[in-house]
Amino acid sequence: MSACLSSGGGGAAAYSFELEKVKSPPPSSSTTTTRATSPSSTISESSNSPLAISTRKPRTQRKRPNQTYNEAATLLSTAYPNIFSSNLSSKQKTHSSSNSHFYGPLLSDNDDASDLLLPYESIEEPDFLFHPTIQTKTEFFSDQKEVNSGGDCYGGEIEKFDFSDEFDAESILDEDIEEGIDSIMGTVVESNSNSGIYESRVPGMINRGGRSSSNRIGKLEQMMMINSWNRSSNGFNFPLGLGLRSALRENDDTKLWKIHTVDFEQISPRIQTVKTETAISTVDEEKSDGKKVVISGEKSNKKKKKKKMTVTTTLITESKSLEDTEETSLKRTGPLLKLDYDGVLEAWSDKTSPFPDEIQGSEAVDVNARLAQIDLFGDSGMREASVLRYKEKRRTRLFSKKIRYQVRKLNADQRPRMKGRFVRRPNESTPSGQR
């Protein structure tokens, strides 16, 4: 298709250009084209070509629910064909054709990039799934080799730690629960008394080869023995330094008698009082026999003798006070409230009787009348004074009201009252002599 344009000036010049119609690709493979729904929505209506200009937003790609799973299955079947079968991938290739260009390098058979997914060559073999896992062991569960040397003050030097291939992981609590805490913590046994090497053994911890395996406490002992300060002359030459050996349990309980015990009689107050009473009785018997009382110390010092005598006297006084308290406690069979009748009589002896003389002589039976005459407030008649004061106040109030009324009445009578045209004065006398 060609077109020609000419300029209208003096020097005629012609410009020509050619337009070629580009055939558009099929609509299934295009991702940026849109179909016009109305003539007003697009500038060019003919077009599914990539050169078409559109104002609408392109549709975003959405995956189907099983598309991600199928892509992962195809990826795994390509990377590991011996483990994952490719049946699912062949069925789903038609469904994932629109998005296959994203995973093209990974799904290609001749691409070298698939080697990146295989870090180990043994994964290609199907026997890899049936190999047992290799158990790594720490150095606290390994066996040790000890070499005795006579020259060292340490006496034993640990050469190396060997990692054993097998470890009995059976439950200690299920097998050795009858042996107590020794089955868990182990027992410390002195293997060589001259070298001072100790071994910590746990019953039941035996390898399949027949050798007793070291437990954690034994490894801790060995690690502490490696310390040069513990082996030096300044150290304490303990298998576990820093007081850790005292935390281990001994072989047996034969040294339990060395533990400090507390006598129960020293704590109990009743037994202590009985002891003091018995001691006092023995002191009295010795005094009656004429013997000297000696508690502790030498007899030669006179000062000590004086101190002893004072101690005995204090013991005697304490015993007497205890006896008195016991007697009083035995006498108090009822309630602990005790009325001091003598003290009450002495307190009221100086005061006069609350009953007046008239009632004292009369032998009336009316108790209420007698109680009415009792002066409860005998201190200068406080209640009577208050009653009199109230009465006077009330009387003066009434008197003042009466006086005020009379004064008002008098003033009203003195004022002239007018009733119509007549004026009457109170001082004016009528002809009849009446007001």
Swiss-Prot record:
This is Protein CHLOROPLAST IMPORT APPARATUS 2. PROSITE patterns: CCT. Residues 29-49 have a biased composition (Low complexity). Residues 56-65 have a biased composition (Basic residues). It comes from the Eukaryota. Residues 21-66, 412-435 are annotated as: Disordered. Residues 1-59 form a transit peptide. GO terms for cellular component: chloroplast; nucleus. Residues 383-425 form the CCT domain. It is found in: Plastid, Chloroplast; Nucleus. Disruption phenotype: Pale phenotype. Defective in the general chloroplast protein import pathway. GO terms for biological process: protein targeting to chloroplast; regulation of DNA-templated transcription. Keywords: Chloroplast, Nucleus, Plastid, Transit peptide. Expressed in leaves and young flower buds. Responsible for specific up-regulation of the translocon genes TOC33 and TOC75 in leaves. Involved in the general chloroplast protein import pathway regulation, including protein import and protein translation efficiencies. It comes from Arabidopsis thaliana (Mouse-ear cress). Transmembrane segments: none annotated. Pfam families: CCT.
